[in-house]
A protein has these predicted regions:
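Phosphate/pyrophosphate-binding catalytic cores of soluble transferases and nucleic-acid-acting enzymes
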Residues: 3-315
């Protein structure tokens, strides 16, 4: 029996997981976790261990990204792509859309299906890795996501409420992992519109696999996660995150579109435009990322309450 003990307090029996995959009992391995929890490094080492067990010269497993912002080209430092970390392991659904466009969950579900079928069609093991709870559930639950039509009557009613009331109402209806949603009244109203629609029209499953995902969650203590976030933020600022945002603007990406992506791109853009000082930007951004990581964990705990079994490890 092969244990994967170097990357977690819970020894993962990778050979047993692989046997379950080969027997059709598991058809996808998913590594999820909040930001700065080490999930990418964990997923890469997992793929390497699968390759070793397979005894092949080429990678026997490939990674599908489950990140809502790493799809955009040119948004590298701010989204933490860290592509060098993948080494020889192939990855999918990174750098597939232009910065300034608005890639959505419907496109992701379609692209995930294509990547999954490509990987499994070549006899490789698919490993989904990411922290975007909505994207992960869209891929692993096989939901048939509806194209929600506008409800003008509901919109007019919600427009009468202030943004704080709308935030509270949305928080009661569904967890939000994209922090930029909560900063725009228009986007909150749209999210509420979708939530109310889904209550009246229950989401059904598609016929697409996977149906039996083995979930591995990477987590560290709250204190360590905060320290990692702060350290990584300073590293990214030193590596040129501000210059990256300036370059995107110089290449024609509208500041409003960058701010739409939230977190790093919202606050760094405001700094570049002179709206915030450097210290204000650094403080507000760090706080926003801390809150974002908390919401990610809330989403994953919600998955567990809905019946998903997540095997938690501490990288």
């Amino acid at each position: 029996m092969v244990f994967f003990a170097n990357f977690g307090i819970m020894d993962l029996k990778i050979d047993e997981i692989l046997r379950a995959y080969d027997a059709g009992e598991t058809d996808l391995i998913c590594v999820l976790g909040p930001t700065a929890s080490g999930k990418t490094r964990f997923a890469v080492n997992l793929c390497r261990e699968i390759t070793r067990l397979r005894g092949t010269s080429e990678p026997a497993a490939e990674i599908i990204s489950g990140d809502s912002r790493q799809v955009y080209r040119g948004m590298d430092i701010g989204t933490g792509k860290d592509l060098c970390e993948y080494g020889e392991i192939p990855y999918h659904l990174i750098d597939i859309a232009d910065a300034g466009t608005r890639y959505n969950i419907y496109e992701y579900q379609h692209d995930f299906e294509a990547a999954y079928k490509d990987i499994t069609g070549r006899g490789k093991v698919p490993v989904l890795c990411g922290g975007s709870g909505l994207y992960i559930e869209a891929a692993t639950c096989g939901y048939a996501l509806p194209q929600v039509p506008p409800d003008e009557e509901l919109r007019a009613e919600l427009e009468q409420e202030d943004i704080e009331e709308l935030r509270e109402k949305l928080a009661e209806l569904r967890p939000i992992t994209d922090p930029s949603v909560m900063e725009s009244k228009r986007r909150i109203i749209r999210a509420l519109e979708v939530a109310f629609y889904e209550r009246k029209h229950p989401v059904r499953r598609t016929g697409f696999l996977p149906k039996n995902t083995y979930f591995i969650g990477t987590d560290v203590s709250r204190e360590e996660r905060i320290a990692r976030i702060d350290r990584r933020l300073d590293e990214r600022l030193a590596e040129g995150m501000i210059e990256e945002v300036k370059g995107l603007i110089d290449n024609g990406v509208a500041p409003a579109d960058l701010m739409y992506y939230g977190l790093e791109y919202k606050f760094v853009t405001q700094y570049v435009l002179g709206i915030l000082s450097f210290d204000e930007m650094r403080t507000l951004l760090a706080n926003a990322i801390h809150q974002f990581s908390k919401r990610q964990m809330t989403w994953f705990r919600g998955m567990e309450r809905r019946g998903t079994v997540i095997h938690w490890v501490k990288p």
